[in-house]
Amino acid sequence: MEGEKLIEDRGFLAAPLTFVVVVVFQLLSKWLDQLKKKGSKNTRESELRTEIKQLLREASALSQPATFAQAAKLRRSAATKEKELAQYLEQHHKEIKLSYDMYGKGLLASKVVIYLILVLCFWRTPIAIIAKQLVQPFGTLLSWGTGGHMTGHVMVGIIPWLILSNRVSKYVCRFVEF
């Protein structure tokens, strides 16, 4: 019963709280990826698009031979606006990518720090105790890093628990939409 005492000493909520931390990191990562893919619509881009549409609409309305020069001028103006929009979008996408990459690196760094803290706090301490029949072929893998054995039970270590939690949270996050 020394394993149960170890779990009581460290807190019986260690496994669920660790899982929640892993799920939160997965959700934040997915949210950041979706924001990066979606991008952001802003007023400058929408203004340029409406101006281009308006100029092309006016140019197509002028189909008389007498108004050909004016229609050509409107089309050239629309073409310059399209070039301006393309340059603006390129610059805007670079800025967005840079900022999201910075947030992604910050998220990764905080994930690594939190995982290291969890490993240091729970090294050689079981996170959970599971009946040996439930995890028959994987018992030794799950008990890696716990430093002890119990008859009839498998003590789950922090590193296998983090790996398992990470895989399960990735699966769960596939069904979450933002």
Swiss-Prot record:
Encoding gene per record: GET1
Pfam family, one: CHD5
Mutant lacking the gene: phenotype: Strong reduction of root hair length.
InterPro entries in UniProt: Get1
Lineage, uppermost ranks: Eukaryota, Viridiplantae, Streptophyta, Embryophyta, Tracheophyta
Protein name listed in UniProt: Protein GET1
Keywords annotated in UniProt: Endoplasmic reticulum, Membrane, Receptor, Transmembrane, Transmembrane helix
Family per similarity comment: Belongs to the WRB/GET1 family.
Gene Ontology annotations for the cellular component aspect, listed alphabetically: endoplasmic reticulum membrane; GET complex
Subcellular location: Endoplasmic reticulum membrane
Subunit structure: Forms homodimers. Interacts with GET3A.
